[in-house]
Amino acid sequence: MKVITSLISSILLKFIHKDFHEIYARMSLLDRFLLLIVHGVDKMVPWHKLPVFLGLTYLEVRRHLHQQYNLLNVGQTPTGIRFDPANYPYRTADGKFNDPFNEGVGSQNSFFGRNCPPVDQKSKLRRPDPMVVATKLLGRKKFIDTGKQFNMIAASWIQFMIHDWIDHLEDTHQIELVAPKEVASKCPLSSFRFLKTKEVPTGFFEIKTGSQNIRTPWWDSSVIYGSNSKTLDRVRTYKDGKLKISEETGLLLHDEDGLAISGDIRNSWAGVSALQALFIKEHNAVCDALKDEDDDLEDEDLYRYARLVTSAVVAKIHTIDWTVQLLKTDTLLAGMRANWYGLLGKKFKDSFGHAGSSILGGVVGMKKPQNHGVPYSLTEDFTSVYRMHSLLPDQLHILDIDDVPGTNKSLPLIQEISMRDLIGRKGEETMSHIGFTKLMVSMGHQASGALELMNYPMWLRDIVPHDPNGQARPDHVDLAALEIYRDRERSVPRYNEFRRSMFMIPITKWEDLTEDEEAIEVLDDVYDGDVEELDLLVGLMAEKKIKGFAISETAFYIFLIMATRRLEADRFFTSDFNETIYTKKGLEWVNTTESLKDVIDRHYPDMTDKWMNSESAFSVWDSPPLTKNPIPLYLRIPS
């Protein structure tokens, strides 16, 4: 039998790219066949041009391979007595006691995992110089937007999520970057200082050091609750389970220093604050609904149930609303809905319950969580592909909501506010003058920036960063250059090696990456003709996009594995997604909320009816809704 297996494997090897031979040798026979399928499709016909059902099949095969070979544990897993989940039927303040086999998994200060093996870059942290890369390849020359696909609410949403998921623990040691002479005159800062990422020993032989996440990586809405008991105490009223919010304005409250009172306010701006305020109102509305159902519920009970419900609503909106607009294709519409509802769909699941299989019934509601043998975490690579600051414009366009809406519910422009005036304390002051409704409507009608080369906001190249408590630091930073440095410092592979690790064929020339002649010329100059030196962020921005995708295909494959993992590894989305844990009313609340529009309508009943023409609150509001397609979704063929 071994001889036959060896013979088959050697034959298959001839069809596999040489860069995958090493990983291929470690695969099971089944996985070798699956890699051959993925590899064959990649070479012959792009998966996104296949009929929807075949495209979904390809993505399921690819996701399986990533789950087997792209989940790398960092840090030792403590061995101890297994706890009883029944003792913790709620989300804890610091993320502990979710995984029954390891109480610390997903808690504040746990390690970032990895999707790709780390590549030590200490010898070339400054090659090419990050400020040269930022100036020649990233800095905005002319604003490029996303058309009608993605608006400023969508741009705010992803930062809202990042504040829920990830933030690296910093060291006390400062690094300084100085602009080389060749670009110094074009750099907003001639030099800047910042704290390096803290390297922490893991106790592992292979991955010796790692980084710690000072946010809880679970989808637990720590963006409004905080990642520890101290912050949670700051945001709670301790009355009827509710969180602090201005009843008069619907905006966040502020402390004596002018800092917003919410779960995470570091490096925030008015768009994120607006979403925090909206979901605090959602939490409080859940408390009221639960209290109406059962007047005997105490403050702590109401808070715990409402947090579960609100977190699930946020996760659902991200899965079947935000991501669908980000990856605007029929295949991903089907795929993201299948992640939540399964291939059998919402009607079947609502009528008959979970079908048992995650493919047929969805990840949500599975009988038990699934971590594929690797303790849950978010990853260094996940952090890298979520570098999306190019979504931000230079000004926010404030519209006149007192005027009569025009064609497609459009509104006249009355003011342009610099994004600098919408950050931190100043942003909170500016927002108080604008008001929630005007801000949300204005963001809804404004297109976000596109994730492209030479579209990184210049105002972010001279910005005041915050410490973890939201206080301004003394040193300005060049965020574009800093992001290049961070990926290198954290041993995230550069673009080509990243692709190899994700079973993607590496590029051999700049023309494989982009057709833009100017970009090719600058890439060749900055990287001295060596495609292997290309930084990941630059490659993700330069890469030709799939039609309908706002992000690169390379970034998407990290989404493919990690979007599912955030749901399937969490018992509150799987074994504990039920009436016992959520209450009957709470589960009904989650199951009947399908979009951000539903949440807006609940708290601002006239807003979308009056000013939103689009199908989703994440696409530009004056865009027409999609026309109904009579062809069943799974049978559609991409145009």
Swiss-Prot record:
EC no. given is 1.13.11.92
Needed cofactors: heme b; Ca(2+)
The UniProt disruption phenotype note reads: Slightly higher accumulation of Pseudomonas syringae pv. tomato DC3000 in infected leaves. Partially impaired systemic acquired resistance (SAR) in response to incompatible interaction. When associated with LOX1 disruption; hypersensitivity to the growth-inhibitory effect of abscisic acid (ABA) accompanied by an accumulation of ABA-inducible marker genes.
User: GO biological process: any one?
Assistant: cellular response to reactive oxygen species
Q: Which GO terms describe its cellular component?
A: monolayer-surrounded lipid storage body
Q: Which GO terms describe its molecular function?
A: fatty acid alpha-dioxygenase activity; heme binding; metal ion binding; oxidoreductase activity, acting on single donors with incorporation of molecular oxygen, incorporation of two atoms of oxygen; peroxidase activity
State the free-text cofactor note: Binds 1 heme b (iron(II)-protoporphyrin IX) group per subunit.
Question: What does UniProt list as catalytic?
Answer: 163 (proton acceptor)
Q: How does it assemble?
A: Forms monomers in solution.
Please state what the protein is called: Alpha-dioxygenase 1
Biological source species: Arabidopsis thaliana (Mouse-ear cress)
